[in-house]
Amino acid sequence: MIQKNKNFATAKAKSIRVSPRKLNLVASFIRNMKVSEALVQLTFSPKRIAKIVKDCLQSAIANAENNLGLDIDRLIITKATVGKSVVMKRIMPRAKGRATRINKFFSNLYITVTEKEDN
């Protein structure tokens, strides 16, 4: 069943093994971009996390096309938000019998694509 009253689709990627600060660099880069241009930029980005962001964006495009029947040539990325997820705590042995804590951060990514109206 295709709903035509909504003109936006979302996708999310949860518990990504990267800090929110690093993920936000890529998310802010693609915000307010056409999806075709964003896919090209993410394909050739040197950032390690760009592949996961690209997969999430392709999921949002597929949701827009298959669930809502939107035209993928007119889609733009309206929201690309990053949130904190769990923090995995680890121990690193140090000198003289001491130990320090290592925090391994995880992130959540939410992408919303909207069909641009013709004016």
Swiss-Prot record:
One Pfam family recorded for the sequence: Ribosomal_L22
Superkingdom to which the source organism belongs: Bacteria
InterPro entries: Ribosomal_uL22, Ribosomal_uL22_bac/chlpt-type, Ribosomal_uL22_bac/org-type, Ribosomal_uL22_CS, Ribosomal_uL22_sf
GO cellular component, one term: cytosolic large ribosomal subunit
Entry keyword set: Ribonucleoprotein, Ribosomal protein, RNA-binding, rRNA-binding
GO BP field: translation
Keyword Acyltransferase: no
GO molecular function ontology, one term from the record: rRNA binding
Annotated family: Belongs to the universal ribosomal protein uL22 family.
Task of the protein: This protein binds specifically to 23S rRNA; its binding is stimulated by other ribosomal proteins, e.g. L4, L17, and L20. It is important during the early stages of 50S assembly. It makes multiple contacts with different domains of the 23S rRNA in the assembled 50S subunit and ribosome. The globular domain of the protein is located near the polypeptide exit tunnel on the outside of the subunit, while an extended beta-hairpin is found that lines the wall of the exit tunnel in the center of the 70S ribosome.
Subunit structure, interactors included: Part of the 50S ribosomal subunit.
Name used for this protein in its record: Large ribosomal subunit protein uL22
Origin organism lineage: Bacteria, Pseudomonadati, Pseudomonadota, Alphaproteobacteria, Rickettsiales
